[in-house]
Amino acid sequence: MANQGKKPTRRSERALAFQVLYGLSFTPATSEGALRAAYAASPDVADRNAEDEKADRQAPATAPQGYAWEVIHGVWKTQAELDEAVSGFSQNWRVERMGRVELTLLRIAVYEMLFRDDVPAKVAMNEAIELSKQFGDDNSRGFINGILDAVARAVESGRLTPKGQ
């Protein structure tokens, strides 16, 4: 039986998604195959796959799965829309000028707010702020909180919705 360990938490899955997406901010994936390769190359995913192979040597290779992959794939597919939303709520900051850590965390949280009905806006905000403590600097939290608070209010009021909906 594959992977008998504990199921990863949403927070650990978000951290994995952050790490993969942050890496992609330096070398963007131009195809879904490249995105899958970046995900598979992540040390956490490679470790999981090694554990799975030990547990079941006959198991066929499976497609990426889990919350981290859903977030990575979702952010990758909707990045232009996410950047437009972030830009619209960041006063005097173009996304091109934002730090990669902050922008990656903003993309993840805005993706969750817009496209994940199972994630309340306040949870997406809190998780981004918690991850900023781990990966960002002292100024990251305030910057991220300010933008995400405005995005959350716009989503809750219906002023910001996913395109095509």
Swiss-Prot record:
InterPro entries associated with the record = NusB-like_sf, NusB_fam, NusB_RsmB_TIM44
The terms describing its cellular component in GO are: cytosol
Give the top-rank taxon of the lineage listed in the UniProt record for this protein.
Answer: Bacteria
Q: Which Pfam families match?
A: NusB (PF01029)
| BP terms from Gene Ontology | DNA-templated transcription termination; transcription antitermination
Q: Name one GO molecular function term.
A: RNA binding
Q: Which UniProt keywords apply?
A: RNA-binding, Transcription, Transcription antitermination, Transcription regulation
Per the record, the similarity remark reads: Belongs to the NusB family.
NCBIfam families xrefs: nusB
This molecule's function is given as: Involved in transcription antitermination. Required for transcription of ribosomal RNA (rRNA) genes. Binds specifically to the boxA antiterminator sequence of the ribosomal RNA (rrn) operons.
Protein's recorded name:
Transcription antitermination protein NusB
Native organism:
Nitratidesulfovibrio vulgaris (strain DSM 19637 / Miyazaki F)
The gene for this chain is: nusB
